Amino acid sequence: MSLDQAIPEALQALRTRFGAAVRAEQATGEAFPVLWLDASVWEAAHRFLREEIAAPFPLLADLWAIDESLRQHRTGQPASRITLCSHLVSLVRNADLRLKLATDGRAPSIAGVYANADWYEREAHDMFGLDFGRETRRILMPPTWEGHPLLKTHYARATEKPPFVLTDRLFEAEERATITDPDLLGLPTLRDGEELMVLNFGPHHPSTHGVFRILLGLDGEEVVWAWPDIGYHHRGAEKMAERQTWHGFIPYCDRIDYLGGVISELPYLLAVERLCGIAVPPRAQMIRVMLCEFYRIMNHLLFYGTMAQDVGAMSPVFYMFTDREKGHEILNAITGARMHPAFFRIGGVAMDLPNGWDAMVRGFLDWMPARLDEYERMVLRSELFRARTVGVGAYDTDMALTWGTTGPGLRATGCDWDLRKLRPYSGYEQFEFEVPLGQRGDIFDRTRVRADEMRESLKIIRQCLENMPEGPVKADHPLTTPPPRGAMQKDIETLIAHFLQSSWGTVVPAGEATGQIEGHRGLTQYSVVSDGGTQSYRTRIRTPSFAHLQMIPKIVPGMTVADLVAHIASIDFVMSDVDR
């Protein structure tokens, strides 16, 4: 797709304003244009696209880097040691734009343009050592870590290093590194001449919903400032993607968000299938949609129950876990697993639906609407719940976009942005469903939107049940992994492909591709770079929760600690999704 066809006004305006500094358009298979810019206009171009152009790009969806030192297939791209990529979204245009910058290890900061670029730039510094010309702290790795893990020169396995020995000296150094001085962070310790209480909220606290620490400055029960500290759950998922085959990385996707099941597999496979040119059969697409909506309900039931629990209602979570069990029994019967199914495949799904699947699904669909009605009476209509949530933790659409908020957190402000409707994938254009919206953007609306989304997911699942097409569940394509078993038993070429893919790995054509979906928490995006091998050269995992937590310091000042707990619950995150 050419840039002129995708966003002609933006292209013309950008070239008119910056001329030759807009260096080149990169030929890719992406659904959006990819432009290279000069460093001299990197910040100015982002400011122009966000603040000055008609129909602007208010959302910085992602900012990430690529170590180009070992890459062989870069025809037509400027020389670069580390390439910096920003991914911008225009809601008015319903269009994306990716900007690239060739660097020698130094890059201008755009944190003054897009507020949420701060954490992304800290991550790029942490993982690649990029210097943004400002003080940049590590964010995922501990401050004592040596090296930058996503550089190609950094080891990927513990066996590549000498055995680890925890000496007394090292233990003391690591212990000192856990101490955070508010003064060094520029955070006040006095208010009106009185000393603030500095409190570590987490990392081991039930209300942080994971291994997550927030450093708080308190005046009595009032939160004066908050400083989130993440990284405790970091496992190096993007580094692992470089050491696994394209097929072998699928189980790792489940663990990016361990409550999302197959939802985290889908954007990765959409990206790989785009690179391979694979068209997924209609039956496989509908199975994917049905399972994604099941896992959306499973996640939202957990959120619903724990949200009520965190404001003092203990009963709902027990009832909702019982209903989640009914859903997990169906998912277990179809995929063979409850939470980590690894069921999707390159080109389709692992196997066809089992006998009796339709009766199980129909029983769930008949059961759940009345249960959701009961939960609405227990939670959303409760005067106590409304008193704790209405008007608390509110933000508007502009603020949400400024900090990269997507999903229910964005739609709670009244912004109608759902990729299943606006950019249908995997056959979502076939389904009739509504996009629930809020008005105030407060805790109550965020809860209400997710409660209503479960009803819409039930509608989608029922349409899958009633309209499931016949046909294969894997594409008839040489790069489908693994190939359909029936073809392997008849066709020697398919058997050879299976042998090569299983023993060596799928050889994916060189190029770049992105898979985007409307995940249960928001925009989930995988950007993959292939160098024509059996493994990914670079896999970028954009999760919604990483952006959502960055917003906490702007929302919670002035709240009580009890309201802080409610606000954290309303974000709906898991730390594996944040830290990867």
Swiss-Prot record:
- What are the protein's UniProt keywords? Cell inner membrane, Cell membrane, Membrane, Multifunctional enzyme, NAD, Quinone, Translocase, Transport, Ubiquinone
Q: Which GO terms describe its cellular component?
A: NADH dehydrogenase complex; plasma membrane
Record region (NADH dehydrogenase I subunit C): 1-171
Q: Which GO terms describe its molecular function?
A: NAD binding; NADH dehydrogenase (ubiquinone) activity; NADH:ubiquinone reductase (non-electrogenic) activity; quinone binding
Q: Where does it mainly reside?
A: membrane
Q: What reaction does this catalyse? A: a quinone + NADH + 5 H(+)(in) = a quinol + NAD(+) + 4 H(+)(out)
List every stretch annotated NADH dehydrogenase I subunit D: 195-580
Entry-linked Pfam families: Complex1_30kDa (PF00329), Complex1_49kDa (PF00346)
Task: Output the superkingdom of the source species.
Answer: Bacteria
Keyword Nucleotidyltransferase in the entry? The reply is no
EC code(s) of this entry: 7.1.1.-
Q: Which Gene3D superfamilies match?
A: Cytochrome-c3 Hydrogenase, chain B, NADH:ubiquinone oxidoreductase, 30kDa subunit
Q: Where found, per UniProt?
A: Cell inner membrane
| InterPro entries per the UniProt record, alphabetical | NADH_DH_suCD, NADH_Q_OxRdtase_suD, NADH_quin_OxRdtase_su_C/D-like, NADH_UbQ_OxRdtase_30kDa_su, NADH_UbQ_OxRdtase_49kDa_CS, NDH1_su_D/H, NiFe-Hase_large
Q: Which HAMAP family match?
A: NDH1_NuoCD_1, NDH1_NuoD
* Protein task: NDH-1 shuttles electrons from NADH, via FMN and iron-sulfur (Fe-S) centers, to quinones in the respiratory chain. The immediate electron acceptor for the enzyme in this species is believed to be ubiquinone. Couples the redox reaction to proton translocation (for every two electrons transferred, four hydrogen ions are translocated across the cytoplasmic membrane), and thus conserves the redox energy in a proton gradient.
Family to which the UniProt record says this protein belongs: In the N-terminal section; belongs to the complex I 30 kDa subunit family. In the C-terminal section; belongs to the complex I 49 kDa subunit family.
Q: How does it assemble?
A: NDH-1 is composed of 13 different subunits. Subunits NuoB, CD, E, F, and G constitute the peripheral sector of the complex.
By what name is this protein known?
A: NADH-quinone oxidoreductase subunit C/D
The source organism is Cereibacter sphaeroides (strain KD131 / KCTC 12085)
